[in-house]
Each structure stands twice: as structure tokens, then as C-alpha cells.
């Protein structure tokens, strides 16, 4: 579990950390509510800030020296805590005595918005709490060198839940890459470390076809942004799938196909193994002119272990991967 209400250290400036955190919560709320309601988002941000202040996590105005990201994972509120706080706030509003009809209507509108927020998070807690309601499983998650996220069954969940989980997961990766990369970039550009001493950041995403479709527009956009920007901060993204057909399923919208094409276009290195001859048109849709007509015809005839490496801005190479018996024995992906 990653707690959506935990504030991560993505910058040395705690104020920036909070702004980034609230910005991500805005996206999470829009995904969970399955609509864009600016007034509800304002009410959501307001109640979240009040909760943090009452818990002495965030001051009313963040000043230099304040620390809002250094609490233990268990000290940040969870979805269940947030639900209790919203209920409390609703009751407090109901106790207020408006001095005019206009003020009364404002309070009624606020209660309606908070009721909507409450229903959304109660549904998440009751039906999908094991995925989203709880403290972050790993303390100091931004300081761990290697993390594996198991999202094996994510495609079986409703889209608003799976998109939320994916957004949280990718945001952690992207924030961690940026935080580490900016430190490394500064040290390298100031001549304090050599390129060999730079700590790089790598995100590997296996079974990528499970989310590379229109059901996960938020994830697709994030992947595209990461693929375009990570190289600037010593980061890289590896995406692996065994079938191009599942990346571009039938009846895909023009927008989702364009997103996938954009994602591939930002990939400097593309390793292509054998694909069925019937899939060549989809390969052409995805890779365009990065392969020649002869190479497209060659793909269905590649032997086991043979790949075509397409290098952006350079020539393509066909090569064979040699695997030792020891490495085959380590592999548990299938017989």
C-alpha cells in the first residue's frame, strides 16, 4: 500500500513538496470521482489542509525550517482517518448559525460538496481498502534503492481504482527520479563528481500491454512525460511486452493510438523480437519510419533469441541474445 495522504520529500523546499503533493491529490480525486468539478476540488483541498493542520503535520503557512515530509509513515492520516475528519467537519458546519439566506445557501452548498467527497472515499474504503486505505508499507520509501510494485491484477479492477493505483505508483517513481536526478545533475555540472559516479535511476515495467490502452489514459500520459523527461535527470524507462497487438487493440480511439505512437517515438532504443506476420501493420503504426520495409518483413521470420534493435538517429542492428543454462534456470516466466 502507498498512502495517498503521505507527503513525500520531492524537493529540498518543503513548500514545494506540499504544492506537488496537493497537485497529485487533485488528480487522484478527479480519477476517483470520475468527473472534473472545480468547486469540489477546492472543498477537497480545503478539508485536506485543515486535517493536516489539526494533526500538526502542516502549519497554516509553511516557513523555511518547517518539516512536513519527515514524519514516520504511521503518522500521516489514511483514507479512514480522512473519512472521520470529513464527517466531523460536516457536523461542525451544521452547528453554525448563518446570519443571512445567502450565508445559509453557501453552507448548504459546502455540505453537499463534502457529502459527495465523503461518499467517494467511503466507497473506496469499503470496496478497495486493501489497495488504498492504510499507511505506506515501506518507511522512508524515497530512500530505498530498489522497490518492486506488484500490479499483476490491476487490470481486473474498475478503471477509477486501477488508474489511481497506477498514478500513485508512477508518481512515486517520477518524483524519486527527479529528486535524485537534480542532485546528481548539480554535482556533475559543478564538476564535483564524474559521470561514472552519477547515481542513475531506472524504472522497468514488465507486461506493459496490460495498461497500454485507452482504459489508462492518466498512466499513458505519465509514461510519455517520463520517457521524454527522465533522460534529463539521469533516468531511464524500460517497457516490455511480448505482443504489439495488445498495445494497440481493435477499436482503439485515435487519441489513444496517438499517445502510444508518441510514447514509442520518445524511446531511443527499441528491441523487436518475432511477431506474427498479421501484426506487421500494427508495428508500422507504432514504429513508423524507424524501421525499413525490409526490416518489417524480416520480423515474422526472426528466430528464437534474435532481435532487431532500432536506434533513434542511427542505423538498426539485428543481433542474437545468448543465454547461459544458469540464466535459463533463473528464469521463472514460463516453460
Predicted regions and their residues:
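C-terminal alpha-helical "lid" subdomain
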Residues: 322-335
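Short helix/loop capping segments that flank catalytic or ligand/cofactor-binding pockets
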Residues: 157-159, 213, 281, 318-320, ...
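Conserved ATP-driven motor cores of ASCE-family P-loop NTPases powering translocation/secretion/packaging/pilus
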Residues: 3-35, 218-322
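Short, solvent-exposed amphipathic alpha-helical segments in soluble enzyme
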Residues: 164-168, 287-288, 326
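P-loop NTPase motor domains
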Residues: 2-235, 307-311
Amino acid at each position: 500500500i502507498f498512502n495517498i495522504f503521505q507527503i513525500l520529500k520531492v524537493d529540498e523546499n518543503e513548500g514545494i513538496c506540499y504544492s506537488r503533493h496537493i497537485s497529485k491529490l487533485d488528480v487522484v480525486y478527479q480519477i476517483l470521482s470520475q468527473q472534473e468539478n472545480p468547486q469540489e476540488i477546492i472543498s477537497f483541498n480545503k478539508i485536506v489542509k485543515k486535517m493536516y493542520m489539526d494533526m500538526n503535520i502542516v502549519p497554516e503557512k509553511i516557513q523555511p525550517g518547517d518539516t512536513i515530509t519527515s514524519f514516520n509513515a504511521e503518522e500521516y492520516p489514511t483514507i479512514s482517518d480522512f473519512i472521520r475528519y470529513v464527517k466531523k467537519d460536516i457536523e461542525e458546519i451544521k452547528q453554525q448559525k448563518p446570519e443571512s439566506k445567502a450565508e445559509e445557501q453557501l453552507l448548504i452548498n459546502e455540505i453537499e460538496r463534502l457529502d459527495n467527497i465523503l461518499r467517494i472515499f467511503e466507497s473506496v474504503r469499503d470496496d478497495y481498502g486493501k489497495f488504498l486505505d492504510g499507511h505506506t508499507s515501506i518507511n522512508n520509501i524515497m530512500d530505498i534503492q530498489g522497490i518492486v510494485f506488484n500490479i499483476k491484477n490491476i487490470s481486473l479492477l474498475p478503471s477509477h481504482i486501477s488508474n489511481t493505483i497506477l498514478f500513485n505508483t508512477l508518481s512515486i517513481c517520477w518524483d524519486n527520479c527527479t529528486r535524485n536526478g537534480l542532485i546528481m545533475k548539480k554535482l556533475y555540472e559543478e564538476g564535483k563528481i564524474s559521470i561514472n559516479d552519477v547515481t542513475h535511476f531506472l524504472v522497468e515495467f514488465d507486461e506493459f500491454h496490460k495498461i497500454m490502452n485507452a482504459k489508462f489514459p492518466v498512466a499513458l500520459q505519465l509514461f510519455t512525460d517520463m520517457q521524454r523527461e527522465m533522460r534529463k535527470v539521469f533516468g531511464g524507462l524500460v517497457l516490455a511486452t511480448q505482443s504489439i497487438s495488445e498495445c494497440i487493440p481493435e477499436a482503439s480511439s485515435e487519441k489513444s493510438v496517438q499517445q502510444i505512437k508518441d510514447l514509442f517515438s520518445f524511446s531511443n532504443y527499441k528491441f523487436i523480437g518475432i511477431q506474427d506476420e498479421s501484426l506487421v501493420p500494427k508495428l508500422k503504426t507504432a514504429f513508423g519510419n524507424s524501421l525499413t520495409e525490409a526490416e518489417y518483413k524480416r520480423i515474422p521470420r526472426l528466430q528464437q533469441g534474435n532481435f532487431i534493435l532500432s536506434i533513434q538517429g542511427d542505423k538498426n542492428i539485428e543481433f542474437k541474445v545468448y543465454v547461459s543454462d544458469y540464466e535459463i534456470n533463473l528464469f521463472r516466466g514460463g516453460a
